[in-house]
Amino acid sequence: MAPLALMGVVLLLGVPHCLGEATPTPSLPPPTANDSDASPEGCQGSYRCQPGVLLPVWEPEDPSLGDKVARAVVYFVAMVYMFLGVSIIADRFMASIEVITSKEKEITITKANGETSVGTVRIWNETVSNLTLMALGSSAPEILLTVIEVCGHNFQAGELGPGTIVGSAAFNMFVVIAVCVYVIPAGESRKIKHLRVFFVTASWSIFAYVWLYLILAVFSPGVVQVWEALLTLIFFPVCVVFAWMADKRLLFYKYVYKRYRTDPRSGIIIGAEGDPPKSIELDGTFVGTEVPGELGALGTGPAEARELDASRREVIQILKDLKQKHPDKDLEQLMGIAKYYALLHQQKSRAFYRIQATRLMTGAGNVLRRHAADAARRPGATDGAPDDEDDGASRIFFEPSLYHCLENCGSVLLSVACQGGEGNSTFYVDYRTEDGSAKAGSDYEYSEGTLVFKPGETQKDLRIGIIDDDIFEEDEHFFVRLLNLRVGDAQGMFEPDGGGRPKGRLVAPLLATVTILDDDHAGIFSFQDRLLHVSECMGTVDVRVVRSSGARGTVRLPYRTVDGTARGGGVHYEDACGELEFGDDETMKTLQVKIVDDEEYEKKDNFFIELGQPQWLKRGISALLLNQGNGDKKITAEQEEAQRIAEMGKPVLGENNRLEVIIEESYDFKNTVDKLIKKTNLALVIGTHSWREQFIEAVTVSAGDEEEDEDGPREERLPSCFDYVMHFLTVFWKVLFACVPPTEYCNGWACFGVCILVIGVLTALIGDLASHFGCTVGLKDSVNAVVFVALGTSIPDTFASKVAALQDQCADASIGNVTGSNAVNVFLGLGVAWSVAAVYWAVQGRPFEVRAGTLAFSVTLFTVFAFVCIAVLLYRRRPQIGGELGGPRGPKLATTALFLGLWFLYILFSSLEAYCHIRGF
């Protein structure tokens, strides 16, 4: 209610001068720069309306009181409706800017070990985009209003455009920040993350308005010279470059190291030059420290590599948090939640929050929630095309293809499978044995024959005889091959080989391998390989220990883990130490080691598993033979030979008795992170791909729910009454602006250009309506600009900052861009307009005159109040409060009241000065 009451006071300021007049004040020529604003005409304003850029004067020019009221209502309602239209087209405009600034490029990163990896990073620097396209998008009405006002009035300076820029700056600095401070929930606070950039933009913001005062009241009072106007415009790229340097720590940031700390008593930030520190810098990072793991080395690499590393760490942290919250879900299920969670919690641009606020206000719904609902309704991708080999033919192969048997087993049984097909044919397939290291006749019995699969049969067995001997020998193997497939009908009659699709085929594995294990030795114990690569997400790794060259007797085999670069004790893996007991004729055992899942994007740590000396549990004849020489009793030659043979059969370690285990990152986890980085691009959420999509979106009413569920999107609720009302109020604008090219066309530039033109037309209409409203009620353009026009252009930014303050983890998106926008408004808005006008009048041989009185007073007042505002924000970084936004209830309410009071005083003093109640400059 306070802003409404303030507007009423402003409207009443000019009334006392006009109550006693029977007729309107006659029209006078506009005063020049040398005229005093204290003249009766300058103090009370004029009821005589002038033609606008697009709108003519409403005839007749001398209406009655009732007609004046009706006209004022029409102008005011039309102006509000135009503000709604500008907000909606700005929605499209900001979406195109988000698409443009979200463009990515691939970079190749070479690590210290020579390995390379490819990633994608944004082409646009965040700070540069915020101060250029983002600032242009959020301040386009103010900037274009100034340019159109000057160019549309014969290059004469007006009061509406500059007043709107200063008034909008005051509203953003005081009211928007006050709202952001207040809406943070109790007990929470938000800090500016990139404080260095904030210092630079805040300094330029204050300098911009100091510079305005200097060129209006000091250098050349009442006249803007060409060099002043051009220098104002040049300050815009200079400001952007300085902010970019601060963000990148270039020049003096590179050569002068500073330590920043906060005095616990005063809360003042203290800097001291010196060696590279290891304390917290202004942006919250640690200088001189590296991130653990290989990616930490990227901290000294290119900025793109650091940016990619930061994006990966954010996504990894999201997956870790969700895994702790939902331990029962697998990675695929977590990815579905993580997509929404990443969109919800990632740092968002000013464009996103502006679009989100506009759509919530106009009944278009929550951007993220609608995107999640559309993704859920969208049919999933197919699992892939069917296998080319799955053509309806039966497939015949060994299952399994590897067999092990002891030398004394007598025979080994092999299985052949028949899968697929129609099951109404008879198949004949031949088999035969082939020598390997085992020879037919001495180690196994040669065999060949034919297997017959009748209709419906899916498995056939064949048996191969094994020859036993008492000679100690190494493990040997031979092969069994399938060949010569023939097809018959159900009765078994062979069918001719036609040219059509085959009914059956032999597929791999066609060759089975049979390994004969010697049973005359206790065995050689070893790992299957010297090296084992495991993924950190495995949880538990199973390591096989094989017993070859014999399997006689019971053997106990000790083992233990040894640290390498990986650390045991639960850091990278759990220590394992124990014994494996191999029974008689047992050829394989498995030991388990638990791996700790650190969920790292890149990882390569190793540890070792060592086997101890095997112990033969002395039982039966082996124990007797080995213990015969322990006593004094002499043994015979036969006994000595038997003992020697038994000694040869003792268990021993093989060559691979030490296994190196390399723990690597989970490839599924790594792929998930890469997919999430690609899919969490907000340009995919707020952008449009076709006109059809835009028109459907324009006529659809959605619930404007600001609350977000971190566990994923909830069920879509029905729109409220407010959503329907706002939708029907704005449906004309929505359908009209659905004709704008989709953001996907020309990478967003087509939409960008059309939106600029549309915003320009609407801004010209707003300027004319505001001017006609002011002259109808007797309100001066300077007051009209700082109150009504500035308020109308800044309302969407207020809601955008509110949403950003609630949803972002830091304060940069909500208030960090306020100072940058204020500076850009002056340098770009006034710089372009005044440069064009100054050059035009210089060519004509005349000066470009600008009345300094009201504008200079407003600029000075705003600058003083802005110093107070920034000082309070920095003071709020004390530990007792916690940050620029939120904090304890007392300081939060006090800050909100102070900032709203500053805005109230700014409007009041500017209005009093405009109506000559107080003396200005």
Swiss-Prot record:
Residues that bind Ca(2+) 3: 407, 469, 471, 473, 518, 520
Binding site for Ca(2+) 1: 407, 443, 469, 473
Domain Calx-beta: 389-482, 512-611
Superkingdom classification of source: Eukaryota
Region: Disordered, residue numbers: 23-42, 371-391
Domain notes per entry: The cytoplasmic Calx-beta domains bind the regulatory Ca(2+). The first Calx-beta domain can bind up to four Ca(2+) ions. The second domain can bind another two Ca(2+) ions that are essential for calcium-regulated ion exchange.
UniProt-annotated stretches for the region Putative calmodulin-binding region: 248-267
Residues bound to Ca(2+) 4: 443, 469, 473, 476
PANTHER family reported in the protein's UniProt record: SODIUM/CALCIUM EXCHANGER, SODIUM_CALCIUM EXCHANGER 2
SMART domains tied to this protein: Calx_beta
Protein name: Sodium/calcium exchanger 2
BP terms from Gene Ontology: calcium ion export across plasma membrane; calcium ion transmembrane transport; cell communication; cognition; intracellular calcium ion homeostasis; learning; learning or memory; long-term synaptic potentiation
Binding of Ca(2+) 6, residues: 598-600
Regulation of protein activity: Calcium transport is down-regulated by Na(+) and stimulated by Ca(2+).
Gene Ontology MF term list: calcium ion transmembrane transporter activity; calcium:sodium antiporter activity; calmodulin binding; metal ion binding
